[in-house]
């Protein structure tokens, strides 16, 4: 029996690791891209999570265009059930409302059909605005959080300091987009959005609660 040298042993181990990574499903194994999980689960019951999780969030607010529906992606870190969508309204406006929603993705991870869209929620007073839902998410799949403000209330927001771009920038001097939007809406789309625009700068910080 031939005894392998230490260098040969290392080469065998390296080949094994490379073959293992090739045969793993890229849609379900996100561990290599993530910090270490703290606790038993990524999504702990009753806590709030948003598109930047588990990366840092810079606390700030922003105002957004009336009639514009915003879409921001996140990748499910584990199987879970979303029971609530939520956002913090920081500046109220009389007669202002919002819709909250979550959308599936297609085979290219682009925004697709809705899994839940809420009825109008009043933003005539500031504070937490939420909608109950029952949406199953699956580890490794991409989902799109969404909001449609009618009127001009302000919210906590995500921006370049906390969200990853969804694709590259168009020039060396421009920002990369963080999500999508559609304009001139009175209600949330009930199908995959068409004529969507890239969104730069900031997006409303829609959050979700799981069980």
Task: Report the location of each language-model feature.
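Beta-sheet-rich sandwich/jelly-roll-like modules and their strand-loop junctions
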Residues: 29-107, 142, 148-211
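N-terminal low-complexity, intrinsically disordered "leader/linker" segments enriched in small/polar
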Residues: 1-49
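Short Trp-Ser/Thr-centered turn/loop motifs at beta-strand boundaries
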Residues: 113-119
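Exposed aromatic-hydrophobic patches
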Residues: 127-135
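Solvent-exposed, conformationally flexible loop/turn segments
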Residues: 67, 124-128, 140
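A short, structured loop/turn motif at beta-sheet edges
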Residues: 136-142
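Predominantly extracellular beta-rich ligand-binding scaffolds that present long acidic/polar faces
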Residues: 108, 123
